[in-house]
């Protein structure tokens, strides 16, 4: 990328359940450039996505966002790098996923701050929902910092859906299975709002709803009755 460039990239995986995917996304940002690397991963048997955002010019910024949902025996594997070479650069990452049945997900992330990257800010967040006893998710955030005067943080969670949220919906007459779908969609909304999808947001919500119970209830998940 050149000075002050603005780039938005979106990858959507809705592959068949017998397909393997090995994907690699790379971006290098120059001075005052801005990049958005975004991923939606719903399909495939095994899907691995490696994303590397490198900031080589002062004032550059990058953001990585992803939404993933694995069911059946699917495996989703994400490996991300936020590399800061130049000073006063900024990166932010938000990955949110859900696993159901006996599916699995693995997230491995690295924030790498070089010796000349003073004044850098870098943040990394990975949240995972486990929707069944047989599903599992693993989150491995990492920091590698070679200079002072930086602000960096990482956070990760793995666990079931919030029972208080489900109870609240059920107390208002919503059926348990529908309440679970709404909680999961609400969990994903933070990512959906940041994706450069425009009018496709409704279609993505429909795909997620179908994966929850293989059918969407009209009028409930943003799908017309």
Show the residue positions of the predicted features:
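Conserved beta-strand/loop scaffold segments within soluble protein domains that form the structured core
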Residues: 4-174, 188, 195-221, 225
């Amino acid at each position: 990328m050149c000075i002050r460039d603005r780039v938005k990239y979106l990858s959507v995986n809705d592959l068949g359940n017998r397909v393997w995917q090995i994907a690699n996304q790379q971006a290098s940002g120059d001075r005052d450039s801005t990049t958005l690397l975004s991923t939606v991963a719903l399909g495939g048997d095994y899907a691995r996505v490696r994303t590397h955002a490198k900031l080589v010019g002062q004032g550059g910024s990058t953001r990585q966002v992803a939404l993933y949902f694995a069911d059946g025996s699917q495996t989703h594997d994400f490996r991300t790098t936020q590399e800061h070479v130049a000073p006063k650069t900024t990166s932010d990452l938000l990955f949110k996923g859900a696993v159901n049945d006996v599916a699995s997900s693995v997230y491995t992330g690295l924030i790498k701050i070089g010796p000349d990257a003073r004044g850098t800010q870098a943040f990394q967040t990975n949240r995972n929902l486990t929707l069944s006893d047989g599903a599992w998710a693993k989150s491995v955030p990492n920091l590698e910092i070679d200079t002072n005067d930086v602000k960096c943080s990482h956070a990760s969670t793995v666990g079931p859906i919030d029972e208080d949220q489900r109870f609240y919906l059920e107390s208002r007459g919503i059926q348990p299975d529908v309440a679970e779908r709404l909680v999961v969609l609400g969990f994903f909304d933070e990512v959906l709002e940041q994706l450069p999808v425009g009018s496709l947001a409704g279609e993505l919500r429909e795909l997620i709803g179908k994966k929850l119970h293989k059918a969407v209830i009209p009028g409930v998940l943003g799908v017309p009755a």
